């Protein structure tokens, strides 16, 4: 399927916040409650429509363990968007956001659009981080923000598409040099070209829900 643009995303955050589950829900529309930790980096892709324009999202799901941080850092380069994920039931994952954000700002394109996601909002009875705290963190750091649930799919679609809409707006405003591949954006010329990984809407490798 042809696309106007290809946007590269990276998903970051602590181990166990549900990064791989968010990706699987977005690409395959299913929830897998138990699987292995993500080792290194995994990949998914899907076509979306933003403002009537077909856009392919190429999404890199990273391991949250400290031992993989150096690998994760190498994937910041060349990403147009990032989903920064914490678990609303685990306070420490929220407390670690500043460290993840510092990493992203240090190693990524300065114009990268970042969506902060408070995952597992279906477990509101176990909530350890208020929605207002998430909103405040996002406001202070210039991030988009949503609470979502990989289990129920609430706001999962919206998180990926709102990030794409922000990137598209930045292109239209002249923020990105789309001819530079390090921007994380490829122009599609109306046909699919050079897109690695599995077919649209699928994950080419297994995902790790806890990763």
UniProtKB/Swiss-Prot annotation:
GO MF annotations in UniProt: GTP binding; GTPase activity
**What keywords is this UniProt entry annotated with?**
Cell membrane, GTP-binding, Lipoprotein, Membrane, Nucleotide-binding, Prenylation, Protein transport, Transport
In this chain, GTP is annotated as bound at 13-20, 61-65, 119-122, 149-150
Its membrane topology, per UniProt? Answer: Lipid-anchor
Q: Name one GO cellular component term.
A: chloroplast
Entry-linked Gene3D superfamilies: P-loop containing nucleotide triphosphate hydrolases
| PROSITE patterns, per database record | RAB (PS51419)
Motif Effector region: where in chain: 35-43
Short name of any one Pfam family annotated for the protein: Ras
Gene Ontology biological-process entries: protein transport
- Grouped into one coarse class, the protein's main location is membrane
Which residues are covalently lipidated (S-geranylgeranyl cysteine)? 209-210
Q: Key word RNA-binding present in the record?
A: no
Write down the InterPro entries for this protein, in alphabetical order: P-loop_NTPase (IPR027417), Rab_GTPases_membrane_traffic (IPR050209), Small_GTP-bd (IPR005225), Small_GTPase (IPR001806)
Compartments (UniProt record): Cell membrane
Task performed by this protein: Intracellular vesicle trafficking and protein transport.
Please report which protein family the annotation says this sequence is part of. Belongs to the small GTPase superfamily. Rab family.
Under the heading NCBIfam families, the entry gives: small_GTP
Q: Entry's PANTHER family?
A: DRAB11-RELATED
**Protein name per Swiss-Prot or TrEMBL:** Ras-related protein RABB1b
Organism of provenance: Arabidopsis thaliana (Mouse-ear cress)
Q: Which gene encodes it?
A: RABB1B
């Amino acid at each position: 399927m042809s696309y106007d643009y290809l946007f590269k995303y990276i998903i970051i955050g602590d181990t166990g916040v549900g990064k791989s589950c968010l990706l699987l829900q977005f690409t395959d529309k299913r929830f897998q409650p138990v699987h292995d930790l993500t080792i290194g980096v995994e990949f998914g892709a899907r076509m979306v429509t933003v403002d009537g324009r077909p856009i392919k999202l190429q999404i890199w799901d990273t391991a949250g363990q400290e031992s993989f941080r150096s690998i994760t850092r190498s994937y910041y380069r060349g990403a147009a968007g990032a989903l920064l994920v914490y678990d609303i039931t685990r306070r420490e994952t929220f407390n670690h956001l500043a460290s993840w954000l510092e990493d992203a700002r240090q190693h990524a394109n300065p114009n990268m659009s970042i969506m902060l996601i408070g995952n597992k909002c279906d477990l509101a009875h176990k909530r350890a981080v208020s929605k207002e705290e998430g909103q405040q963190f996002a406001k202070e750091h210039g991030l988009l923000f949503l609470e979502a649930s990989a289990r129920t799919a609430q706001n999962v679609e919206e998180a990926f598409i709102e990030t794409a809409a922000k990137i598209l707006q930045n292109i239209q405003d002249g923020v990105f040099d789309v001819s530079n591949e390090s921007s994380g954006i490829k122009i599609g010329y109306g046909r699919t070209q050079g897109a690695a990984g599995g077919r649209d809407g699928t994950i080419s490798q297994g995902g790790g829900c806890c990763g």
